Amino acid sequence: DIGEDRVGNPFCEAIHWPAAGVVALGLAQRVVFLAPATGAELSRLTLGTIDGGDFFGHLAIGDDGTLYVLGWCDVIAVAPSRKVRWIARGVAIDGIVWCEQRGPHLLLEAEMDPPGGWVPVVLDAATGRHVER
């Protein structure tokens, strides 16, 4: 049932996450954490809120081993324990891409005026707070 509701979201990525000892697979409205040796599902993270949802976009691993889940609107920081550290809501309206981590800052691009209205965004890696837009 991993990909049963993928219709409408073309994004699907998998990344080996050594700090957590898992493979993270993002698609639809979730990230599934899999055992590398067996492919067994260990846990999953659902994107969005109870009254609506964000959709999966991309995955990135920060300098300290944190997994960053980039949705269409939100950014979620996940610790190697697979617990959510923070959620930055409303970062974009139609997509977020990873540029790099520079020290304590996450450098992202956020689409704010589709199509093509990409703007740079800087988040604090420890808190998810907007540093600069």
Identify the residue ranges that each predicted region occupies.
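Short, surface-exposed charged micro-motifs
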Residues: 23, 67, 98, 120-122
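Surface-exposed loop/turn elements that mediate protein-protein interactions on large endomembrane-trafficking
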Residues: 1-5, 31-51, 73-92, 118-133
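A generic hydrophobic-segment detector
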Residues: 83-114
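Histidine-/acidic-rich catalytic cores in large beta-rich domains
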Residues: 8-11, 105-108, 131-133
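Repeated scaffold domains used in trafficking and secretory/extracellular systems
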Residues: 2-20, 47-64, 91-103
